[in-house]
Swiss-Prot record:
InterPro entries (alphabetical): RNA_pol_su_RPB10, RNA_pol_suN_Zn-BS, RPABC5/Rpb10
Gene3D superfamilies referenced in this protein's UniProt entry, alphabetically: Homeodomain-like
Any single biological process term in GO: transcription by RNA polymerase II
Protein name: DNA-directed RNA polymerases I, II, and III subunit RPABC5
Record keywords: DNA-directed RNA polymerase, Metal-binding, Nucleus, Transcription, Zinc
Subcellular location: Nucleus
């Protein structure tokens, strides 16, 4: 779904780091741990928020509940 704005455990803002994280993985070809460290995510609870997020918003945008199926 949508990236959580804050860490569920400690409350640190993590939502603004998602785009930069994806950019580091794709363009700079860093591994996950290095990218998270460069973003300043030191606590394991905050790292978990980014590592375990599954971005499903694009799939849900294609779904139209009012569309009739034949």
């Amino acid at each position: 779904m949508i990236v959580p704005v804050r860490c569920f455990s400690c409350g640190k803002v993590v939502g603004d780091k998602w785009e930069a994280y994806l950019n580091m993985l794709q363009e700079e070809e860093l591994d996950e741990g290095t990218a998270l460290s460069r973003l300043g995510l030191k606590r394991y609870c905050c790292r978990r928020m980014i590592l375990t997020h599954v971005d499903l918003i694009e799939k849900f945008l294609r779904y139209n509940p009012l569309e009739k199926r034949d």
